UniProtKB/Swiss-Prot annotation:
One of its GO terms (molecular function) is structural constituent of ribosome. It comes from the Bacteria. GO terms for cellular component: cytosolic large ribosomal subunit. This protein binds specifically to 23S rRNA; its binding is stimulated by other ribosomal proteins, e.g. L4, L17, and L20. It is important during the early stages of 50S assembly. It makes multiple contacts with different domains of the 23S rRNA in the assembled 50S subunit and ribosome. PANTHER family: CHLOROPLAST 50S RIBOSOMAL PROTEIN L22-RELATED (PTHR13501), LARGE RIBOSOMAL SUBUNIT PROTEIN UL22M (PTHR13501:SF8). This is Large ribosomal subunit protein uL22. Keywords: Ribonucleoprotein, Ribosomal protein, RNA-binding, rRNA-binding. SUPFAM superfamilies: Ribosomal protein L22 (SSF54843). Belongs to the universal ribosomal protein uL22 family. The lineage of its organism: Bacteria, Pseudomonadati, Chlamydiota, Chlamydiia, Chlamydiales. One of its GO terms (biological process) is translation. Part of the 50S ribosomal subunit.
Amino acid sequence: MFKATARYIRVQPRKARLAAGLMRNLSVQEAEEQLGFSQLKAGRCLKKVLNSAVANAELHENIKRENLSVTEVRVDAGPVYKRSKSKSRGGRSPILKRTSHLTVIVGEKER
């Protein structure tokens, strides 16, 4: 099992979970293809994290890329940046800029 994380990514967790669903329980090649065709911003971020996890596997255990599959994908909510927008009659409305923590774990395919 090899893990890679990206923290404090400026992507809403709800939207990132949609992209994470595309790559669950797939081989690394299939997951990369799925994320490559995805037009979501989170897809680009998850592809980078996936490549990092694969690089960890290749570097530390000398496992070939073809023998790896996505074991777990986790998207957790990070801190929320709070901004405000002025409204009529002296009021304001909050604008919440959400962040995500992305975790991808890859492991060897079960034979």
